[in-house]
């Protein structure tokens, strides 16, 4: 009989969001007339920008003609999309990238998991706590960890607490690690890191021959001009950092699927025999073997985001969500709730009132306010006592949800 990958059995029962879905389904089945407002999972609600949608339609129409038909595209992505991203998104930051250093994908969630294919299993990994669950769980799935302890910490992973004391920015590890996950603007806490704070991590990585996985999925939501949008804005990052970006929240592509990975040619690892080797070459080899490229219509739509009109419309949608974030943040503060984030990120990280557990507060909001959020403990043990609300809802629902919560907590 074929053997399974036993590493999957190490995972705690139920990925966070399916568990939320299960509880919501149970509630709605028992309360069919209740209007449940979902501010939990970070799915977008606004339509695609008109210019983006027009490009999407035009690309589909291309497939109906012999002259314009597009079959298999380049696995790394079309140059016209890669160059548009470099010119419009990176060069204004003072970051110069080569076309060969960027890879278009079908989403950064997959990329954050798939990048592990090119790293040896005996690398020591450091992740924040709380953290986007994909970082933790994919390392378990691939076989890098031992079992989880009673807190949920897995053997062979170094956890870096992110709490009020350190402003939810992890401190440098006290031991040598090989791979470091950083996410700014952060999911779930909504916090951001300054250039000086990122420089500490870059210096650590270069001094210890470590690699930083920098998740910049929410960089488009930054409002403070002093906060870096890319880790490559900081000197030395091209030698030690791989950056992930996503169109999911930036352009509303959660149902369209498109992302990108930047792997600079300078980022090197070592072979088992101690020789240096390019991670860019390994990722290209992995990509051409396991991926046939994001679809042509999707890449045409993504390129339209960077047109003058496309970006103007996309920015209006981003501003809409950030106004939602302001409404949530300010509304909760009115009733004395301690909140973080929601200024340079679309997530509000709130401290649960009265010392309630994260899941107890989830049940309270669901049952008493008919509002769904995300328990902080689902992102890791250090998230206990906190709760995440998303700004990606419809404005009228956000306003109503905040009013319900305020009334309940007064």
UniProtKB/Swiss-Prot annotation:
Substrate binds at residues 15, 42, 109, 132, 187, 292, 388. GO terms for molecular function: L,L-diaminopimelate aminotransferase activity; pyridoxal phosphate binding. It holds the Pfam family Aminotran_1_2. GO terms for biological process: lysine biosynthetic process via diaminopimelate. The keyword tRNA-binding does not apply. InterPro entries: Aminotransferase_I/II_large, DapL/ALD1, PyrdxlP-dep_Trfase, PyrdxlP-dep_Trfase_major, PyrdxlP-dep_Trfase_small. The modification N6-(pyridoxal phosphate)lysine is found at residue 249. Keywords: Aminotransferase, Pyridoxal phosphate, Transferase. Pyridoxal 5'-phosphate binds at residues 72, 108-109, 132, 187, 218, 246-248, 257, 292. Pathway: Amino-acid biosynthesis; L-lysine biosynthesis via DAP pathway; LL-2,6-diaminopimelate from (S)-tetrahydrodipicolinate (aminotransferase route): step 1/1. Its EC number is 2.6.1.83. It catalyses: (2S,6S)-2,6-diaminopimelate + 2-oxoglutarate = (S)-2,3,4,5-tetrahydrodipicolinate + L-glutamate + H2O + H(+). SUPFAM superfamilies: PLP-dependent transferases (SSF53383). Its cofactor is pyridoxal 5'-phosphate. Homodimer. Belongs to the class-I pyridoxal-phosphate-dependent aminotransferase family. LL-diaminopimelate aminotransferase subfamily. HAMAP family: DapL_aminotrans_1. NCBIfam families: DAPAT_plant. Involved in the synthesis of meso-diaminopimelate (m-DAP or DL-DAP), required for both lysine and peptidoglycan biosynthesis. Catalyzes the direct conversion of tetrahydrodipicolinate to LL-diaminopimelate. This is LL-diaminopimelate aminotransferase.
